[in-house]
């Protein structure tokens, strides 16, 4: 079995794949001080509860945008699972060309989204990832990653609004029933939700206009289910796309070499 670890700015997600499907996913807040032993005490207990045999895990891969967390995650894999994990970095064979000015600046999560989107749904495509930042990742008709856009995430905007305006409450995001709010909470919820829908729709239209063909538009990330219901522009809802990217990258680097071809990709509805 394969253990996939996706370490983001807000949360770290652990997931186990048995070669056919995901057996489970577990999420813990990102804490740079957390040790390998703490990961083990938490995760192995959860494995026991759902019947995942840790001894059956023979492969692992880590993708992270938090470099300081990498050391303890690798140590957890080595010391508690007896597995040397792959790390999603430039040393691996990604199988996707990157057409950006400085590939070293490109976050692993964005490249993973492009890889998984292309392999699962075909190219061209736009992946919108609703995470700590809201990212737009673009793959052209030739299957090449060619850039995108980055905007502040929804929860960052909520935090900033609360900090800058002390009388405005800290609130959770949700879809309002109307755009016109008749009290402060509803007005804030409207501005946050419909404001982000407008941002997303505007960038999707602008990016699509610059592409060589009509793209498949994919929503992923923790808030993807909420925002995908607010606009008709999304063709696919794939909340676990980054995990699928890590799985595909691990398979590519521990199995027979693979090469991309449009015929091998699965289109929408197939």
Swiss-Prot record:
Q: Which UniProt keywords apply?
A: ATP-binding, Coenzyme A biosynthesis, Cytoplasm, Kinase, Metal-binding, Nucleotide-binding, Potassium, Transferase
Specify whether Metal-binding is a keyword of the entry. Answer: yes
Q: What EC designation does it have?
A: 2.7.1.33
Report which reactions are catalysed by this protein: (R)-pantothenate + ATP = (R)-4'-phosphopantothenate + ADP + H(+)
Residues annotated as binding substrate are: 107-110, 184
| NAD among keywords | no
Look up the record and name the cofactor or cofactors this protein needs. NH4(+); K(+)
Copy out the cofactor comment.
A monovalent cation. Ammonium or potassium.
TM region(s), chain numbering: none
Pathway(s) annotated for this protein in UniProt: Cofactor biosynthesis; coenzyme A biosynthesis; CoA from (R)-pantothenate: step 1/5
Q: Look at the named UniProt entry and state the broad enzyme category this protein falls under.
A: transferase
Which cellular components does GO assign to this protein?
cytoplasm
Where in the cell?
Cytoplasm
InterPro entries found in the cross-reference section: ATPase_NBD, Type_III_PanK
Binding locations of K(+): 129
Active site per the UniProt annotation: 109 (proton acceptor)
A Gene Ontology BP annotation from the UniProt entry: coenzyme A biosynthetic process
Q: Which positions in this protein are listed as binding ATP?
A: 6-13, 132
A molecular-function term among this protein's GO annotations: pantothenate kinase activity
The similarity comment for this entry is: Belongs to the type III pantothenate kinase family.
Function, as annotated, reads: Catalyzes the phosphorylation of pantothenate (Pan), the first step in CoA biosynthesis.
Q: How does it assemble?
A: Homodimer.
Supply the name of the protein: Type III pantothenate kinase
Q: What is the scientific name of the source organism?
A: Gluconobacter oxydans (strain 621H)
């Amino acid at each position: 079995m394969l253990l996939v670890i996706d370490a983001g700015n807000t949360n770290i997600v652990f997931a186990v794949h048995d070669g056919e499907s995901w057996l489970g996913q577990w999420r813990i807040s990102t804490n740079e001080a957390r040790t390998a032993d703490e990961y083990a005490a938490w995760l192995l207990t959860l494995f026991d509860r759902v019947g995942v045999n840790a001894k059956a895990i023979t492969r692992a891969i880590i993708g992270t945008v938090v470099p300081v967390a990498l050391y303890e995650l690798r140590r957890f894999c080595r010391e508690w699972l007896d597995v040397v994990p792959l790390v999603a970095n430039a040393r691996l064979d990604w199988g996707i060309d990157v057409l950006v000015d400085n590939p070293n600046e490109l976050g692993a999560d964005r490249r993973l989204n492009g890889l998984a989107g292309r392999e699962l749904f075909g190219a061209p495509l736009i992946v919108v990832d609703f995470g700590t930042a809201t990212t737009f990742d673009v793959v052209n008709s030739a299957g090449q990653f060619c850039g995108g856009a980055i905007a502040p995430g929804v929860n960052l905007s909520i935090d900033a609004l609360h900090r800058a305006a002390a009388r405005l409450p800290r609130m959770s995001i949700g879809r309002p029933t109307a755009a016109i709010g008749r009290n402060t909470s509803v007005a804030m919820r409207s501005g946050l939700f419909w404001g982000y829908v407008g941002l997303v729709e505007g960038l999707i239209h602008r990016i699509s206009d610059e592409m060589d063909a009509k793209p498949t538009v994919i929503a992923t990330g923790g808030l993807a289910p909420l925002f995908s219901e607010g606009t008709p522009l999304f063709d696919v809802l794939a909340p676990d796309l980054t995990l699928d990217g890590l799985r595909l990258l691990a398979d590519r680097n521990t199995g027979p070499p693979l090469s991309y071809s449009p015929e091998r990709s699965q289109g929408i509805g197939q």
